[in-house]
Swiss-Prot record:
GO terms, biological process: nitrate assimilation; regulation of nitrogen utilization
Assigned protein family: Belongs to the GST superfamily.
Annotated keywords: Nitrate assimilation
Gene designation: URE2
InterPro entries: Glutathione-S-Trfase_C-like, Glutathione-S-Trfase_C_sf, Glutathione_S-Trfase, Glutathione_S-Trfase_N, GST_C, Thioredoxin-like_sf, Ure2
All copies of domain GST N-terminal, residue ranges: 162-246
Domain GST C-terminal: 255-404
Keyword Heme: no
Protein name, UniProt field: Protein URE2
Taxonomic lineage from the root: Eukaryota, Fungi, Dikarya, Ascomycota, Saccharomycotina
Length: 404
């Protein structure tokens, strides 16, 4: 019995030991699996670290590349700035050189003008001794302050009985403007070109007929020596008198509406066209200092004035073409130009009506000097150029501009 119990205890012990060993083996098996998982996790971690490292390297390379591009761009910008600065410096140097050349030209022109005036003085006053060392500018100044009115006084002491006497100056466009009208009307007139260097324009006898002491001035000897000053007033007096005496509105009109338009253009020329060109010439050649803003301002204003005239003449030409070539008027109005109309491009057109008037002729002398302020009317204002060319071909205009 005891022996059986002993044997049974032994079997239980063995059974428990086997179970324990089995559990140990199972535990070892689980432990092996965990270690395998740990190895896999470690490998993945290494792989991730390598990926991260590669990403960092790529990012660093990208940053370096971007930095290089920025550096290249900065260098290009610096080079461009340097180039712009060099160009600006070159432009400034060129402008300075141009200004110096213009100043030299102005000085030469002033010297030539002074020499011319001095030469005239010596010819007209050979016995007038000038002290040594006196500059030409001082002599010109003295001549401007002194008045030699002997020639003017002699004229007024023995005036003509008929015709007209025009007081003008060799370089006065407004004087030639009046001469052109007198010549076109075939009126008998004599011209006295005043010598400003002698102060003839300030002679008491001349100031009596023109209190402004400028040219032109006109004496109508047929009307009890009536004196008229200001070019526009002189022109209107002459054309109206001619119309009343002959009944022919030559250079004028018998239509009141056209007369108003002629007056408008005549006043536009005397108040806007002539003064702007005169000021542009003054600041470009004769002003004591170079004032670019003044030169530009008056030159631009002259261009604006010519733009007004150009538009008016272009409208007159369009009306002429549509009237003379009625068959193609619709095509021309639509913006096309048939070959049949090309022959009309050189036809003369006028500011008022279908004939030349004093409104047109008043522009001629000033149009002849506008190139001296850098305006090429042939290129910039083709209608003005053709208009001026037609007037310059007229025999009366040629005669007047020659001072005959």
């Amino acid at each position: 019995m005891q022996q059986d119990m002993h044997n049974g205890g032994t079997g239980n012990t063995i059974s428990n030991l086997s179970s324990a060993l089995r559990q140990v083996n199972l535990g070892n098996s689980n432990t092996t699996t965990d270690q395998s998982n740990i190895a896999i996790d470690f490998n993945q971690q290494q792989l991730m670290e390598e990926v991260n490292q590669n990403s960092m390297n790529a990012f660093n390379i990208q940053q370096q590349h971007q930095q290089q591009q920025e550096n290249v761009q900065k260098q290009q910008e610096q080079q461009q700035q340097q180039l712009q600065q060099q160009q600006q410096q070159q432009q400034q140097q060129q402008q300075q050189q141009q200004q110096q050349q213009q100043q030299q030209q102005q000085l030469q022109q002033q010297q030539q003008l002074q020499q011319h005036h001095h030469h005239q003085q010596r010819q007209q006053h050979p016995n007038n001794n000038v002290q040594a060392g006196t500059s030409q500018q001082q002599m010109l100044f003295q001549g401007a302050n002194s008045i030699d009115s002997s020639r003017i006084t002699k004229f007024f002491q023995n005036q003509p009985m008929e015709g007209y006497t025009l007081f003008s100056h060799r370089s006065a466009p407004n004087g030639f403007k009046v001469a052109i009208v007198l010549s076109e009307l075939n009126m008998h007139y004599n011209t006295i070109f005043l010598d400003f260097n002698l102060g003839e324009h300030r002679a008491p006898e001349f100031v009596a007929i023109n209190p402004n002491a400028r040219v032109p001035a006109l004496i109508d000897h047929n009307m009890d020596n009536l004196s008229i000053w200001e070019s526009g007033a002189i022109i209107l007096h002459v054309v109206n008198k001619y119309y009343r005496e002959t009944g022919t509105p030559l250079l004028w009109s018998d239509n009141l509406a056209d007369q108003a338009q002629i007056n408008a253009w005549l006043f536009f020329q005397t108040s806007g066209h002539a003064p702007m060109i005169g000021q542009a010439l003054h600041f470009r050649y004769f002003h004591s200092q170079k004032v670019k803003s003044a030169v530009d301002r008056y030159t631009d204003e002259v261009r604006r004035v010519y733009g007004v005239v150009e538009m008016a003449l272009a409208e007159r030409r369009e009306a002429l073409i549509m009237d003379l070539d009625s068959e193609n008027a619709a095509a021309y109005s639509a913006g096309t130009t048939p070959l049949s109309q090309s022959r009309f491009f050189d036809y003369p057109v006028w500011l008022v009506g279908d004939k030349i008037t004093v409104a047109d002729l008043s522009f001629v002398p000033w149009n002849n000097v506008v190139d001296r302020i850098g305006i090429n009317i042939k290129v910039e204002f083709p209608e003005v150029y053709k208009w001026t060319k037609h007037m310059m071909r007229r025999p009366a205009v040629i005669k007047a501009l020659r001072g005959e």
